[in-house]
Structure formats: C-alpha cells, structure tokens
Amino acid sequence: IGPAGEIGVHFACIVNDKHRAAGRSGVGMVMGSKNLKAVAVRGTGGVKVANPKAYRDAALESYSMLKENPVTGEGLGALGTAVLVNIMNQSGGLPTRNAQTGTFEGAEAISGETLASSYLKRNKSCMGCIICCGRVTKISDSRYGGDGEGPEYETLWALGAACGISDLAAITKANYICNEFGMDTITAGSTVACAMELFEKGLIKEEEIGMSLKFGDADAMVKMIELMASNEGFGAKLAQGSYRLADSYGVPER
C-alpha cells in the first residue's frame, strides 16, 4: 500500500507491479489500519497439466477467438479501455459533472484516440494476456509533467467528464498521483466531482477551502487530489469519499 493507506484514506488501494491496483472497497485502508505495509509471496512449486495437448489446443482456440473479435483484437489493443470514452458518450452513458448528465462535450479530447496520439509511449500486457490493453504514458509538453501507466476508461470519466474537465494532461497527472499514493481513481474523481457540485450549489464555500472549485477547473481538480492524499484540512473530508462528504453538508444524495 502507499501513503494513502497508511494515513487512512477511505478509498486507498493495494498496488502491485508498480501501477496495477486492487482499487475498489478501500482494502488499502484496511491493510493500513493493521499496520500491514505489503504482502510478498514467492512460489516454489510448479503446475502440472494433465493433458498438455488438449490444453494447448484450447489455448490456441481462445487466442484465435480473441484476435478475431473486433473489441479484443482491435479496439482494446489499439486504444486500451479508453476506447469506451467516445462509445459511452455517444450512447449517453458517460458520467458528466457528477453524473448530472451522460454526455460530455469534451469527450473527444479525453478519448482513447486522443490519448494514443498524444501521451502514449507503448502498450503493456498483464502476464499471459494477448490483448495488451495497458497504457504506458508520458507527459512532457505540459506543466502536468510525469510518466506512468494509464489512465484507464474509468479514470478518464471520473477525473475527466465527471469533473467537467477535458484537459487530458491534467487527468493523466491526477492519475499518476493516485497511483503513487495508492488511491482508487474512481472514488477519488467521483469525490472531487461531488465537491464541485456542492461548491457550485453554494454548500461548500471558497473561504473554507481557500480556492474556487468549479466544474472544468483542471488545476483545482489536481489540487483536490493532492489534498485528499494528505488527509489533512479539507483533504480529510475528501479522504472519506463522496457519500460522507455530501452527508457532512446535509445532502447525502449528491
């Protein structure tokens, strides 16, 4: 786990292989509450296949099916899970401005197509997987510089459309911060989106947080991600997730 799990961020996750996260349900916070930093396992045995030929035949059949499928053979390999951004937006299912609507006017700017043509360095595959939908990215032409893995589809809508943000560099930077601190990007982005709606409805005041927090403000979104990772000040409210944040202002339905 990262610093977020150690200090009690409710949506802290368990990270393995540098950037791969067991992101949901706050399992990183559970480990942190037990003063458990990591679990390391090294196997000593092997796996014996009962019928090697049948196993190989089944594997080749699965390989062919995956390669011939337009989603697993083309879309995911070329654009990663971010291939879903434009698809979901066109179907009206892309959570936008804290899910007040399902269509985002800036979807193309945060799509898999745009990511592939701007910050993608190379694809990456999970062990044994032929789809190779992982994204290794680097930002060098923006003040939001950095490098790492992602963002995935869920991260793009949570830190992007849900916050009204079409700045792909800012979204990718916030994703890097979440990875480094060990925070679930879905809850992190959804919590910022909730805070933005509460701010625009006048429930959260600028005097309380020391800055404006409107939908579409990329700098404010990145700052909120940094605050929640610290679990201090207003960040301590953010670190409890969207439901508890909204409930603290008397509107848990937000």
Q: Where on the chain are the PLM-derived regions?
A:
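Intrinsically disordered, low-complexity segments enriched in small residues
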Residues: I1-R254
